[in-house]
Amino acid sequence: MFLAQEIIRKKRNGLVLSAEEIQFFVKGITTNAVSEGQIAALGMAVYFNDMNMDERIALTTAMRDSGTVLNWQSLNLNGPVIDKHSTGGVGDVISLMLGPMAAACGGYVPMISGRGLGHTGGTLDKFDAIPGYQTEPSSELFRKVVKDVGVAIIGQTGDLVPADKRFYSIRDNTATVESISLITASILSKKLACSLDALAMDVKVGSGAFMPTYEASEELARSIAAVANGAGTKTTALLTDMNQVLASCAGNALEVKEAIDFLTGAYRNPRLYAVTMGLCAEMLLLGGLATDEADARAKLNRVLDNGRAAEIFGKMVSGLGGPVDFVENYSKYLPQSQIIRPVFADTQGYAHSMDTRELGLAVVTLGGGRRKPGDELDYSVGLTQVCALGDKIDASTPIAVIHAQSEEAFAQAEDAVKKAIHIDEIAPEKTPEIYAYIRATDL
């Protein structure tokens, strides 16, 4: 028998908590035996004194086990259960292509995703732009679509990791969100509750990233890779660039359109292609679906080129309640804004740098993102044809096209876009799309 206040005191004094103490405290979070004040106090103690790797693994697994842990054995799946998670960015539409691509190569992808908050877009919000798509299906339907189609992208159910829901809301109100240990446990507890065989983790770097510096992003990536592998899930973390919008657009329905264009081959943004292939190839390798990276990439290109990945996306949409002809006729179903108009820079030169966070906030201002949880979204608004760093910009070249519902909203977004994209006489140095892979062998 432990006392919550003694566990808090121990961590406050910089000592190491045992797995049993952590399990006791997490159980108290779930059952309300531990008060909000005590949760806040432990969060602050961890923020200042951190946790070692054993503590992080114990916290992650205790939170994972605080609710339902999905079990796929009864479905007799004939392939590995694999997934991807991103720390979030702007124009990050990867999940919509990666899930069907991995499924087309023999994997099963039960992807639990979130909604957008702040400047980052949420995968679930993109699917909410599709009429009829159920982002919160019954567990029976979720399992059926995973088995029959190979991929289902849905929201977190109430019985999955309840400890994280309570802990996170308190961290958000007590300035302890930025702890690497607590971020690691929050992300991984939800992913590991899906009983994955393998996970590819996309940790963003740059002006649109969650973490403020490359060093902080790398520290988080290493922590996630170490804890996930320590908890028994094969995991690789990739450090990927978010110094510019990842796709050529940002906004929910607009990103769905770009995802379908990617899957069908109508248009594949080269940066989006590079990061999607890097993450998806790693999933195939970790899941034993490819012998090496070249084999993985060949398989992925094949399912893109023969239409299998696009077909699976369509089956997932219809399986979860969306239109059966969505891939073929998406323009019939996706909402469109009243005003669609280009923005031009005031100077000529090269797109030199981008405040990606500000571009994400411009989408929020248009109505495409949330200022606070529960806000209603306008799925039609956002930005398209966003220039890439290094693009030559002149008086006839738009730096973006704004999709807005009013002249006032357009004017606000236009001002934000012009301020966020810096034009210079000198072209910037090219940065890689993927900075590093952190595999189990690198830890």
From Swiss-Prot:
It is an enzyme of class 2 (transferase). Its EC number is 2.4.2.4. Pathway: Pyrimidine metabolism; dTMP biosynthesis via salvage pathway; dTMP from thymine: step 1/2. The keyword Lyase does not apply. Gene3D superfamilies: Nucleoside phosphorylase/phosphoribosyltransferase catalytic domain, Pyrimidine nucleoside phosphorylase-like, C-terminal domain, Transferase, Pyrimidine Nucleoside Phosphorylase, Chain C. It comes from the Bacteria. GO terms for molecular function: 1,4-alpha-oligoglucan phosphorylase activity; thymidine phosphorylase activity. Keywords: Glycosyltransferase, Transferase. GO terms for biological process: pyrimidine nucleobase metabolic process; thymidine metabolic process. One of its GO terms (cellular component) is cytosol. Belongs to the thymidine/pyrimidine-nucleoside phosphorylase family. The enzymes which catalyze the reversible phosphorolysis of pyrimidine nucleosides are involved in the degradation of these compounds and in their utilization as carbon and energy sources, or in the rescue of pyrimidine bases for nucleotide synthesis. Homodimer. This is Thymidine phosphorylase. It comes from Shewanella oneidensis (strain ATCC 700550 / JCM 31522 / CIP 106686 / LMG 19005 / NCIMB 14063 / MR-1). The gene is deoA.
